[in-house]
């Protein structure tokens, strides 16, 4: 059980993308969007009565971690931010989160607003399936469109791993996702990185605001980089079974054509495994009936195998 701080906004973005079909529709900020946002908390400078597109609100949410954007999106999607929080908790349960409870859409501290590293991974994994989300969280800077109260403005990411490729703590393999910080939560970061065919998620919570290597950089970033580098150095994607290759077979009854049928994997089965592991050394455990009754056609599911 940990406090997530602004990594909460991954769920806010996910629900917005799942429920809003037109990201160019505008949302007008209201007084309620600022009631729970402290003056010194992260923001995008959105003013009362300002009309901002959902798309720009998502960028404001995920790059500078704007709390007013979180409340605007929550109200727009849920009807009220309180109803939206109910949606957040329902969606978390649907994703298999067992240690998460949200109280607000932005992550500002409340004692009953908590999660776990594994639950954040489940939420982030689902969010990263969305192309727009992936584009947003891998963006360093975004130009928000002119509004009724603002000229164009540029907002910047708080993700120090991608902010500047010239800094020694940057990490070229990092493609997102979200930072977080409160005094109670410490420094938090949900990360995602790719190297070749390998893909890694990382979640670090409660980190120091100063790393050993770089005193001005939070340990959440340097720890994430170390975790991902270790992961890529020691693990790689390996194919356990290919769609067209025989995995096993089973007997067939009541058929005049054959007494057995070849079984193949429904899709290529790929897993992230230790580099030194030989796939041939893995033990195959099958949950397949010894025999099945005809008729059987290509594509029918007969059973499952576990490596």
Residues covered by each model-derived region:
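Active-site-adjacent loops and short helices of periplasmic peptidoglycan-processing enzymes
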Residues: 1-118, 122-131
């Amino acid at each position: 059980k940990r406090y997530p701080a602004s990594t909460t906004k991954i769920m806010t973005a996910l629900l917005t993308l799942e429920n809003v079909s037109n990201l160019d529709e505008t949302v007008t900020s209201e007084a309620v969007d600022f009631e729970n946002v402290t003056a010194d908390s992260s923001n995008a400078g959105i003013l009362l009565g300002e009309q901002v597109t959902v798309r720009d609100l998502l960028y404001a949410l995920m790059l500078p971690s704007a709390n007013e954007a979180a409340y605007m999106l929550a109200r727009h999607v849920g009807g009220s931010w309180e109803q939206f929080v109910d949606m957040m908790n329902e969606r978390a349960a649907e994703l298999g989160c067992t240690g998460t409870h949200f109280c607000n859409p932005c992550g500002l501290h409340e004692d009953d607003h908590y999660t776990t590293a594994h639950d954040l991974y489940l939420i982030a994994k689902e969010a990263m399936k969305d192309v727009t989300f992936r584009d947003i969280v891998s963006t360093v800077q975004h130009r928000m469109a002119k509004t009724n109260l603002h000229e164009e403005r540029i907002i910047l990411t708080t993700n120090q791993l991608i902010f500047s490729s010239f800094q020694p703590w940057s990490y070229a393999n990092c493609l997102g996702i979200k930072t977080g910080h409160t005094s109670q939560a410490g420094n938090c970061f949900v990360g995602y990185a790719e190297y070749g065919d390998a893909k890694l998620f990382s979640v670090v919570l409660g980190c120091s605001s100063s790393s050993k290597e770089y005193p001005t950089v939070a340990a959440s970033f340097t720890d994430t980089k170390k975790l991902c580098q270790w992961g890529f150095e020691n693990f790689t994607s390996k194919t356990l079974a290919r769609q067209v290759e025989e995995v096993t077979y089973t007997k067939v009854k009541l058929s005049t054509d054959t007494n057995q049928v070849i079984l193949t994997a429904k899709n290529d089965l790929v897993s992230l495994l230790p580099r030194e592991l030989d796939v041939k050394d893995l033990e195959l455990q099958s949950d397949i009936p010894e025999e099945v009754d005809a008729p059987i056609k290509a594509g029918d599911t007969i059973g499952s195998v576990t490596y």
